[in-house]
Amino acid sequence: MAVRYQISGGSSAAISASVETGIRTGALTAGSALPAVRALAAELAVSPATVAKAYQELRRRGLVVTAGRHGTRVRPRPPVATRRAALRPPSAPGARDLSQGQPDSRLLPPLGPHLAALAAEIGPPVGYASSAVLPELAEVARARLAADGVPAAEITVTGGALDGIERLLAAHLRPGDAVAVEDPGWANLLDLVAAAGLRPIGVPVDPDGPTVAGVRDALALGARALVVTSRAQNPTGAAVGIDRAVALRDLLAGRPDLLLIEDDHAAELAHVPLHPLAGATPAWAFVRSVSKPFGPDLRLAVLTGDEATVARVAGRARVGAGWVSTVLQRLVLSLWRDPATAGLVRRAGQEYERRRDALLAALAARGLTGYGRTGINVWLPVPDETVAVTALRDAGWSVAPGALFRIGAEPGVRITVSTLDDAEVEPLADAVAAAVRPTGPGGFSA
């Protein structure tokens, strides 16, 4: 018989901390029921109000959910540091790791020459009264966004795409509000939504992005914000097509109460045209990161949007982090202005496309339908994730289980192709075919 985790504490803070410890250590797993308020109060010799306050704080932080007569349970994706990592099985010794979702370091532009040039040119250290955004960076960013059809009168910078999205959600929403997110979608975003105490509503995805019907359903369920990946959607590789963009803009036009967030994290690597939704709603933001083209360690994203939204994000940053390092801003500006770097990024995008298409073709030759219009990943629907991931691990290949990315979507696995060598394509496809049975064509979601 399983031993029940013993919650302890004599105050609401201590009780909530004890529950969080149980979740973090795995003693309280996803879906585990917490004791009824009065039962736990009697057990701990505290008032029911003290336990109720502890549970309220856990709900606010996205660790637990309350479902009427079903009581209070641990959330399926509680936002604690070890939870998401626990969903990803460790690579077997000597296994080829295709689970991480990172660009190929061999294809990233060299930063050394740009850093050396900055060291020679940079002036005195910037003081606390400096502007948050370098004017020259804002000027180049506006031109680059305008070339893609994104209005960019207002510009600020954040510490990466997720930082920008977090600030946007905090500026417009309150705990308990609903956010429409792609399903399957970016694991970090799903965890962020939970950590903020927001309620995710999954929107089905097909190769052209979030479906119109799915967005309409999410709006009917009360979504206050919608997050859309413009291109290279993680994990499916979807990209918003022109017809889908038109249909979504028409749908969103009558929603003055909705915050629209677009994430164009792939930027120049995407190799398909951008069809933005920017401006479809009064409150909107478009976020473009530099991490995929230039390297994950460059934590900078450009954020544009309506005047009020950008002002909220910039104002909150001023009383928090202050600003994104101007050294980093100057480095990004130098990379943007360098034609040689642009050529390297363009060739990297072409190479990712070639590797992705090679794996998709090899899977198709074995009766398997994978997906990946853009980006560095291939999404493969499977009947059973655990069986597929385990079989591939035993065969020497590590892939990411779809549970990292799903709310209600059908099972699948994500295979990162960014570092996939030509000689590995056929052996990998053979291993995948042996691990899963063929699945028919269709979308990614239930």
PLM region spans:
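Residue-level detector of anion-binding/catalytic polar loops
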Residues: A178, R199, L259, T369, ...
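Conserved glycine-rich beta-strand-loop-beta hairpin in the small C-terminal domain of fold type I
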Residues: G349-L360, L368-P381
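Conserved core of the PLP fold type I
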Residues: P125-P256, E268-P282, F444
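N-terminal basic, amphipathic alpha-helical segments
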Residues: M1-A119, V126, E139, R318-V324, ...
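Short hydrophobic/aromatic beta-strand micro-patches
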Residues: T304, W379-P381, T416-S418
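Hydrophobic residues in beta-strands of the RecA-like P-loop NTPase core, especially within AAA+ ATPase
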Residues: V181, E262-D263
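Conserved core segment of the aminotransferase class I/II
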Residues: F286-G349
